[in-house]
């Protein structure tokens, strides 16, 4: 079979692998996990030669260095649903880097006030799906239009601290988190927990590609900012239209 042939060839050549298999240094094994999907990002790293163009830094190291902060949200219970006008943001409310304009569940001002200081939501924060199914890894940027929210426990809140040594911005980070290189890592590190899939604390093992060129970081940040700003305008216009139709 082709797989066996490739294996024997790999003993004598610089075989990097293909869709049928790839080689991995034993030192790169993670907690004896042998599932090939857990190491697909190594293949991408070699193919894209990311080591030459990017700093590959784990989220855990970015936290230790004070570049980013990560927290998770809270549950309010079903009895809180429909008690007010404050959005309770769940995994299904996140799409295309934004929070949907019509979240399914709204909660009271009192519940919001009891959690606002703890959750400390600010424009520029990133919400990322932590648990669920196909939505894990999906991201949204907090804006001035939706900073008054409560977000659930199945979401991470990621904050980029300004003036960090990498020049990293929240706009660049949300693009990096949405890249194929990071998506494959998220898929590889997502495991079933009881009856729900979860990324959990393994988010700290994910490698973030940060460009060595500050101009690239600035250009990508501007692209993302423009994309989000345009989407916000379209979202708010559609919301206004749906209100004005009854005026």
Where are the regions that the model predicts?
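Generic recognition of stable, solvent-exposed alpha-helical segments in well-folded globular domains
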Residues: 116, 122, 150-153, 168, ...
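A short beta-sheet element
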Residues: 90, 118-119, 127-176
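Sequence-specific dsDNA recognition surfaces
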Residues: 60-77, 92-123
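Non-catalytic DNA-recognition/assembly elements of restriction-modification systems
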Residues: 1-77, 212-247
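Short, contiguous, well-structured surface segments enriched in hydrophobic/aromatic residues
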Residues: 56-59, 85-92
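Short, well-ordered loop/turn elements at secondary-structure boundaries
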Residues: 82-85, 120-124, 151, 202
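A short glycine-rich beta-alpha junction/loop motif
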Residues: 148-156, 190-215
């Amino acid at each position: 079979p082709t797989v066996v042939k490739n294996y024997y060839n790999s003993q004598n050549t610089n075989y990097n692998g293909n869709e049928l298999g790839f080689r991995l240094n034993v030192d790169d094994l993670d907690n004896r996990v042998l599932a090939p999907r857990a190491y697909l990002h190594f293949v991408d790293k070699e193919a894209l030669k990311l080591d030459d163009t990017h700093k590959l830094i784990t989220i855990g190291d970015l936290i230790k260095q004070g570049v980013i902060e990560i927290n998770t949200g809270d549950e309010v219970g079903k009895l809180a649903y429909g008690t007010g006008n404050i959005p309770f943001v769940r995994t299904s409310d996140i799409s295309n880097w934004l929070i949907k304009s019509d979240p399914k569940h709204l909660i009271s001002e009192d519940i919001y006030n009891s959690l606002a200081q703890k959750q400390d939501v600010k424009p520029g924060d990133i919400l990322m799906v932590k648990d669920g199914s196909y939505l894990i890894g999906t991201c949204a940027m907090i804006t001035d239009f939706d900073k008054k929210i409560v977000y659930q426990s199945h979401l991470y809140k990621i904050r980029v601290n300004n003036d960090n040594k990498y020049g990293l911005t929240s706009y660049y980070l949300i693009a990096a988190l949405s890249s194929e290189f990071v998506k494959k890592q998220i898929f590889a590190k997502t495991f079933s927990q009881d009856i729900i899939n979860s990324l959990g604390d393994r988010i700290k093992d994910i490698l973030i590609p940060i460009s060595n060129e500050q101009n690239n970081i600035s250009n990508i940040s501007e692209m993302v900012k423009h994309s989000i700003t345009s989407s916000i305008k379209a979202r708010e216009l559609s919301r206004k239209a749906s209100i004005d139709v009854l005026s």
